[in-house]
Amino acid sequence: MIQTISADGIGYGATLQNHFLIAMPGMRDERFARSVIYMCAHNAEGAMGIIINRGQQLGFTDILVELGILERSQSIRLPARARNIAVRSGGPVDRSRGFVLHSDDYVVESSMAVSEKICLTATVDILRAISTGRGPSQALMALGYSGWGAGQLEAEIADNGWLACPASPELLFDAEIDTIYDRILAANGIDPLHLSQVAGHA
């Protein structure tokens, strides 16, 4: 049985870091309709996350070429893992900036540990490492991010805009973009048809 708690219970002593935020049917901002956000940081000062189910027209190879890391003619030499890295539209903030969510088998000084198994790196070094096969075993890239000021996310959850549930690397990295939303709900025992009846946390 799914246990839910009131959004009023989300105080500054709690954190939604390493959680998925699922947009509820009551989401008022159309930019986030049916979106799934992986929360990278959440504290009294605000919150930051990456939308993981919005695709980008640019592919990973395109980004490497644009940054001068790779010549277009060399793209065939990219490791298969690099060619298959998904690029997402991470959110409306700083959309020209890249962020890489990845497994913890690649860590540099600039990496931020989001959980024991998931890190966030936002420097070009990780792109170079991935392009040469020295990067993490699992990764996705996003352009832009989603951000909230102090208390803003808590207010949106209280307004039934979001459902929060624990994240997993399997769903973060392995789910197809078109099925992530429903798969995360299913993993938490939630029927999408009954989503409007669920509030707060799963």
From Swiss-Prot:
SUPFAM superfamilies assigned: VC0467-like (SSF143456)
Record-linked Gene3D superfamilies: VC0467-like (3.40.1740.10)
Record Pfam families: DUF179 (PF02622)
Cellular-component GO terms for this entry: cytosol
Source taxon at top rank: Bacteria
Family: Belongs to the UPF0301 (AlgH) family.
Name of this chain's protein: UPF0301 protein Meso_0753
Origin species: Chelativorans sp. (strain BNC1)
Upper classification of the organism: Bacteria, Pseudomonadati, Pseudomonadota, Alphaproteobacteria, Hyphomicrobiales
